Every structure is written in structure tokens, then in C-alpha cells.
């Protein structure tokens, strides 16, 4: 699994498709190449202290490790934003939510339409 590390990559993924799920939000963006899928993980301080945030990130990384080979598409960047519910949700449910979020993300248009001004 390749990781996103640069801020620019995270910001670029934020312009793509968002697929909310129980415990996290999945952001997906097509890069336009055939390289393997890349994943990034982020959890804000709203979720809790460092121990809780790291626990959420570990759970999200494990979900991706177990499922991304099958469901993720090459040439895409994915960012998982952890939410507080990820601390208490059963792991099996989070795995199902991840699979559903990937399906929803790939079923939507890959670019957002431009916002028209009202002038």
C-alpha cells in the first residue's frame, strides 16, 4: 500500500469525490495515471487525545490493508478522515462501510461541477 504524505496530495484529494460512512469519510480522486492506488489517513483533534487518534488511524490502516487490494482502483488517491465513531464501531462494520464507500465513490462523477456565479 502506497501512502500519501505531502500536504498537496491531501488537498488535491479533497477536491475529488466524498463518500461519508459510519466512522470515517472517504475522499477519492483520479490522478490520471496507472500507478497503484495511494492512501492517506487523517484524524483531527476533535476525535480525542493522541492515543484515541492513533487508535482510529491504526483501525483505518488495517481496513485498507485488508480490502484495498480487491476494491481500490489504480491511478486514484484516497484519503480516509477518521471520526469519533470509529473508536467504538465494530471492526466488521467498518470493513463493510469501507467497501460501500469505495463503491459509492467510484459510482459518482470524478469531478465536481464548477459553481456558477449569480452575477
Stretches found by the model and what they are:
Residues 1-119:
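Positively charged, solvent-exposed patches that mediate nucleic-acid binding
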Amino acid at each position: 500500500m502506497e501512502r500519501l504524505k505531502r500536504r498537496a496530495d491531501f488537498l488535491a484529494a479533497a477536491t475529488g469525490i466524498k463518500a461519508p460512512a459510519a466512522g470515517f469519510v472517504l475522499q477519492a480522486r483520479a490522478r490520471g495515471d496507472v500507478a497503484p492506488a495511494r492512501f492517506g489517513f487523517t484524524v483531527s483533534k476533535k476525535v480525542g487525545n493522541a492515543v484515541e487518534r492513533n487508535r482510529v488511524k491504526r483501525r483505518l490502516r488495517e481496513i485498507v490493508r485488508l480490502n484495498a487490494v480487491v476494491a481500490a482502483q489504480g491511478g486514484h488517491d484516497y484519503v480516509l478522515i477518521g471520526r469519533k465513531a470509529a473508536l467504538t464501531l465494530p471492526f466488521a462494520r467498518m470493513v463493510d462501510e469501507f467497501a460501500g464507500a469505495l463503491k459509492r465513490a467510484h459510482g459518482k462523477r470524478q469531478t465536481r461541477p464548477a459553481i456558477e456565479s449569480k452575477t
